[in-house]
């Protein structure tokens, strides 16, 4: 698998900031997995500073809150599945830093 270029990182950041899922970002820029799109997003985010970075982190944090709400609602009757997804969500938050 190819390593995303800086340009791919910037595309990932722009697409994610526009509200695309990591899976949709990966498809759009030719990556194999959503986790690769997330890594590209995070690399681009780390190159940002100050107010721009804060704005991007706040927007991503808001998306993750919305995702948690959807997970808790959708998977309420499947506690093991919900717990697995919430653990994955915790990792997304941890990587966001």
Segments (PLM) and residue ranges:
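Short, amphipathic alpha-helical "recognition" segments used to contact nucleic acids or chromatin
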Residues: 3-20
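Residue-level signal for cytosolic alpha-helical hairpin/rod architecture
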Residues: 9, 22, 65-68
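Short Lys/Arg-enriched helix C-cap and helix-to-coil transition segments
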Residues: 45-63, 67
């Amino acid at each position: 698998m190819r390593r995303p270029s800086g340009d791919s990182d910037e595309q990932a950041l722009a697409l994610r900031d526009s509200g695309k899922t990591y899976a949709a970002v990966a498809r759009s820029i030719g990556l194999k997995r959503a986790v690769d799109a997330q890594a590209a997003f995070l690399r681009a985010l780390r190159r940002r500073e100050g107010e721009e970075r804060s704005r991007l982190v706040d927007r991503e944090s808001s998306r993750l809150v919305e995702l948690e709400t959807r997970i808790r609602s959708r998977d309420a009757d499947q506690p093991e599945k919900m717990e697995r997804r919430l653990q994955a969500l915790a990792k997304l938050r941890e990587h966001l830093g």
